[in-house]
Curated annotation (Swiss-Prot):
Signal peptide: none annotated. Residues 1-23 are annotated as: Disordered. GO terms for biological process: translation. InterPro entries: Ribosomal_bL32 (IPR002677), Ribosomal_bL32_bact (IPR044957), Ribosomal_zn-bd (IPR011332). The keyword NAD does not apply. The gene is rpmF. Pfam families: Ribosomal_L32p. This is Large ribosomal subunit protein bL32. Keywords: Ribonucleoprotein, Ribosomal protein. It comes from the Bacteria. GO terms for molecular function: structural constituent of ribosome.
Amino acid sequence: MAVQQNKKSPSKRGMHRSHDFLTAAPLAVEPSTGEVHLRHHISPNGYYRGKKVVKTKND
């Protein structure tokens, strides 16, 4: 059975647990289309910050 060699202090225990809780992804709303997408990514329609930057299949 595995046994720890040294006791982990409360501070180190907290640092170890600090990444256990997930946060919601930061979402942004495209001003021209109203579509929701990840921040700093283009929307599925090819818009970024209100401007068309990528041609899509429908264009």
